[in-house]
Amino acid sequence: MATMTDPPVEGFRLSQLIYDTRYRSMTIQVVAFILIMLGLVWLANNVVTNLQALGKDFDFGFLGNRAGYDINQRLVEYSNDSTHGRAAIVGILNTLLVAVLGCITATILGVFAGVLRLSKNWIVSRLMGVYVEGFRNIPLLLWILVIFAVMTEGTPQPRDFRGEDAEASMILGDSVAITNRGIYIPNLVFNRSLGGNEVDAETGAVVASQSAGDMILLLVVIIAGFVASGFIGRRATAIQEKTGVRPPGTFWMRLGAVIVPALIVLVALGATLEYPELRGFNFADGIHLRNSLIALWFALSLYTGAFIAEIVRAGIMAVSKGQTEAAFALGMRPSWTMNLVILPQALRVIIPPLISQFLNLTKNSSLAIAVGYMDVRSTLGGITINQTGRELEGMLLLGLFYLITSLIISGAMNIYNNSVKLQER
């Protein structure tokens, strides 16, 4: 029973959804969500209607059809009799290959360029400035074409390596050949495969048919070694923080955790190096890095490295000058100051924008078609769509690949960023 002191009961009115601040934001969000869903339903209905008008259906069965085209640069077995799904896998691996190589070299180049741009040496600083401004302000596609032209027109032909008075010669102890058809480097061959070897009936030679699986095993062992090395390093750091003394031999233990297991696997698999050799009109054996891969890799590295250099420079400048002065007051060398004091603190500023550069490099690799490098854009998003007419399914798969790859890169880098950021109480 209500009394004279009870507050009046306010009834709900529809106008409150707009004028009452307690409900307004929720109302706007619900309306926006409904409009977006209606738009997606309209688009889906429009696509279905158009497909029916063209006599098409939505199906991914084309991935099992014969591809009928060749891919020159590949990491796994492939022929023109393989399926479109196999071609897509080859393209995905080619994309990941150039993305990983590009991220590594761009980071190394960007760190060096960013540090050297802050050098007190006028010539070094200005040279790095020219590099950064030059590559940042010229389109990436142009650099890809320029490097590709230099590789094809400015390097010797394989026939120039022939004869006693050859015009060209191999480098690094006759193990690497740079030609207008690409770069030939030694190949790691396993003579004792864990999956069993095939023996040539005529020659009795061992064919390492399981080399792909053996290489995966080697990579897994190396990654596990790095994980163990990181655990040893963290354990040593914890002991040092507790006792003030770092355990002796930590560096060699970390190094051994990576090298020793890898060497054991290499010896167990009978690993040897297969060197490129000139036979007839071209080089045989070894690994052939084609000009398309080299041009794309170098261009992505140089272009993205210029942006990373500015990120590194900004991160270093964000660290208080007092840190440098304190390090010098303790008698530390400039190189030690940069490696042990400045860069570890600058990482907190560098990592977030660095994630965006890694994502940009991965997506910029789709320009590979300009020089004939068969990445996933060229295979699944190019030739496969042209042959099958499945443009909707192909583009959906292509977009899904780039989405998943970007999320993985972003997630991994965010985990690393959380490990280096300042821990507050």
Regions found by a protein language model. Give the residues of each.
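Transmembrane alpha-helices and adjacent helix-loop boundaries
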Residues: A2-R425
